[in-house]
């Protein structure tokens, strides 16, 4: 039997987070507009500024669950495009989105994604991946940077010459080094902190445009 969680059972910090979440205008907007998560508005702002995703494109969405970015990508690419989504967590099906559940850190998942693509060139890789946090920044930060590096490595393997890359990364230890990897890999780099990113959050999104070479 499921146990209902009441305010009395939550810690003080959890209650504060819950209040903030429920009062969040982007949470309310997502519920009203039918998006699965407030994160939708981060990608929507990026898309509005840079028009990265276009009809007919092939998109790979890493760290996709619960699926708000895939919702947007699917609508933008239309019936002639392809969206492949992957996450370690389960995700409810979406029209015209192919979903692969698995841990992207495992080579098997990496290879399965390549098999699904079957040699098809990808136009854009988008990654909202983040590890489960421990609360210890010295542990969490390297884990997140590692996921970013895996996403970049994958992008290098599947993107065409004009390919694009959008990745969430936390500022902190390893950020400058990873940013340089993206600079070395794309003709243009943009750094964006969308309005939907909470002010206290260290997250930013790096946007690479025009793949120029593989990582050395």
Curated annotation (Swiss-Prot):
This is Ribosomal RNA large subunit methyltransferase E. The gene is rlmE. HAMAP family: RNA_methyltr_E. Its main location: cytoplasm. Its EC number is 2.1.1.166. NCBIfam families: PRK11188.1 (NF008390). One of its GO terms (cellular component) is cytoplasm. It comes from Acinetobacter baylyi (strain ATCC 33305 / BD413 / ADP1). The active site is at 168 (proton acceptor). It catalyses: uridine(2552) in 23S rRNA + S-adenosyl-L-methionine = 2'-O-methyluridine(2552) in 23S rRNA + S-adenosyl-L-homocysteine + H(+). Specifically methylates the uridine in position 2552 of 23S rRNA at the 2'-O position of the ribose in the fully assembled 50S ribosomal subunit. The keyword Methyltransferase applies.
